[in-house]
Amino acid sequence: MSDDSPQRATGKANMKAVYGWDIDHVEGSFVEYTVDHLFGRVWEEGSMSVKERRLLLIGLCMGSGLEDVAGLQLDAAVRQGELDADDLRSIVVFLAHYAGWPRAAKLNMEVEKIVARMAAATDVDAGDDPDLP
C-alpha cells in the first residue's frame, strides 16, 4: 500500500492516538500490516473509544501472560491522559482476580514504575528539584 493511501493515513493517526508518537517511515511487510490493517482497520471497527479498546487489550495481555505488553499499554494510557495512578492500581487488583496473582504481581511492578515516573514528572512540573535539600 502506498504511503499516501487513506488507510495508511488512518493507521498512522490511530497509532498516534494510541501511543502518542508519530510513525514517519513504514518499511517492511510486518510494519505495513501493523499500520494499514491493525491500526487502519481493526482499531477503526465499531464505535469503541481508544480507551475501551486499550482496556480490552490490557485484559487480553494479562490473560496471556504478556505483562510487559500490558505495561506498555498502561504507560501509553497515562501519557494520553486516559488513566491516572488510582486507575492503574485498580486495574492490577481487578485483573489479579481473573488473570492470577503472579501475573498481577508482575504487572504491579510495571505499574509502580509508571506511578513513580508520574510523581517525578509532577514534582518537576511543580518546580521541585529532587536534588535540592
Q: What is the meaning of each model-derived region?
A:
Residues 1-51, 74, 79, 103-133:
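Acidic, glycine/proline-rich low-complexity segments that act as flexible tails and inter-domain linkers
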Residues 52-61, 91-92:
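Short, structured motif recognition centered on aromatic/hydrophobic residues
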Residues 59-65, 95-99:
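Generic structural signal for hydrophobic core residues of well-folded globular domains
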Residues 64-71, 101-105:
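Short helix-capping/linker segments at secondary-structure and domain boundaries
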Residues 66-89:
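Mid-chain, well-packed structural core segment of small domains
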Residues 83-108:
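Charged/polar, low-hydrophobicity segments characteristic of intrinsically disordered regions
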